[in-house]
């Protein structure tokens, strides 16, 4: 029994993203609209094929609209948005589609380079599709859904949104619907377990992917050699050495890799930043014009900074970044090392080392 208790104490609770929360509230409101039912929970589909059962409630009617809400659950991630209520109000329309809009409490994009145009509400394409897919399990067309976040504007002031160019509320995000506790120190044990599985299949190369998007595209290139590491770049290198791998390849989006290029082997924001400084330096080395460098310096995010460059210029800059990241990794590891930079849509932007 003691052994089981010790094992249970190491398990981590996963959470749900704001996108999944909004999808659950939206599905509940449409069930209320179409069927006049008020379930206590709903199940929603996710982009990775899993289904999530999420508590819903707070049903109400507002003229011809039917409303319901769900609360975000962040699991064991420290998150200011834990418990945040997202309200969805739905109504009938003459449209042959399902329309999703965001109202008070959802932020507005004010800078280029983010997932949407300037002036749009900050709902990522994947999260929006997840909401639509959830609603389609009730009705295929002819409804609209409006999203409200009562405390969104207030809480967003304490998030990264104002720093990246989203004003007036939170963002509705999520690539999988599930929030993984990837920045917790205990997650290193999970990394070790995943790496052991890769090692047991006979692979001598371990591929590291910080997040969901990089993991997805890295799997398309390297198959089952890939593990997800969150912010733990340095610790993952040590794990690879301890387990006897001969090569490690880091596959990352630009936002994480510029931190590694700056010498950060744990990329969590509590340990530092230096993203735009690194991007600016790399742009100078790559020969980018002064006019564009001045725009990069004033950017609020890596995505915005890169949006001012042509495709060719982005590749040149990312080559500098990947070379510097490789240099930093070589300082702490004697393994054969490689770095691959990929874009949000999975295109390879640059490579360095042995990949």
Swiss-Prot record:
It catalyses: Co-precorrin-5B + S-adenosyl-L-methionine = Co-precorrin-6A + S-adenosyl-L-homocysteine. It holds the Pfam family CbiD. One of its GO terms (molecular function) is cobalt-precorrin-5B C1-methyltransferase activity. Keywords: Cobalamin biosynthesis, Methyltransferase, S-adenosyl-L-methionine, Transferase. GO terms for biological process: anaerobic cobalamin biosynthetic process; methylation. Pathway: Cofactor biosynthesis; adenosylcobalamin biosynthesis; cob(II)yrinate a,c-diamide from sirohydrochlorin (anaerobic route): step 6/10. Its EC number is 2.1.1.195. HAMAP family: CbiD (MF_00787). Belongs to the CbiD family. This is Cobalt-precorrin-5B C(1)-methyltransferase. It comes from Sulfolobus acidocaldarius (strain ATCC 33909 / DSM 639 / JCM 8929 / NBRC 15157 / NCIMB 11770). The lineage of its organism: Archaea, Thermoproteota, Thermoprotei, Sulfolobales, Sulfolobaceae.
